[in-house]
Structure formats: structure tokens, C-alpha cells
Amino acid sequence: MLTVSGLVGKTNRGPLDPRKDSLLALQKLDFRKAFAFDRAMLLSLPQGTVTAKPPEFDAPATFSGPLLREVLGFIEAAKVKVTFVAIDGYTGWLMPEDIARSDWILALSANGKPLGLGQQGPLWLINTRADGETPNEAHHGHWVWAVFYMRVGE
């Protein structure tokens, strides 16, 4: 469901295999080692919720999923820039100070229903807002949906 490579201290898989990892290879990603999370692993980490009304939704929704800082902590990731890659190749990134200042989650569900492909899933990077703050175009660029890969470091 999610592969994380780069400056991580804990790994559970070897290098990219272009035949078996065709979606990763299609995006021209490459790594020697990584950590691969399945849904159960992500659900076992401390979870967070975010209630927001992104442009893709007609009404506010409650999103839930593992806290990004917990995902990164679990794999002993360096506190450096993290790049998020969506299935369609779209990328976004966060710096450590961005991650520390807000409760970012990798949302697995909205209103209790899993986010599927075509519904901003399997994972949607989304965060809490200050009281009264609403997402705008500047924020929306960080809300990467259909996330399946993260790279820690350049």
C-alpha cells in the first residue's frame, strides 16, 4: 500500500524490481532498500482524524489514518524533506518543520469508509487546520492524494 525509501533506519524489503514493482518503475522511482507498509501495519500505528471540506467533497468529511510523524518515527526516518508521490505521478513535499507544526495524517478513510482508487485513495496526505482556517490553493498543493510512495531526503 505504501513504500518508503531514502534515509530510513528500518527497512523490510530490498531493491526495486522493475518486473514486480511495475507501478514504482513506471514512475521512474528507484531504491536499494525501503519499508513497505500494508493496510494492517498502517492501522496498527497511532491514528489521527481531520475534519475538513476539501474541494473534491460536497460537504465536510472526517478523515482518519496514521499520523505521519508516527509513520516516519516507526521506520526511524531522518528529519529531512519528505516527498510524496501519487499514483498518477503528482508529487508534493513537506519539510520537517511543516510536519512538526501540524497533525498530518495519511488518511485511509473518509467518514469511516476506505478511500479507494478513484476516491483520493489509497492514502491521502491531509492535515489539521487552525480554528477558522480553510484550505486554499496554497494548502491544497500539500494535500497529495492517491499516495503510494514516499522518499525521505533528496
Ranges and model annotations:
Residues 1-154:
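N-terminal intrinsically disordered, low-complexity segments enriched in P/E/S/T
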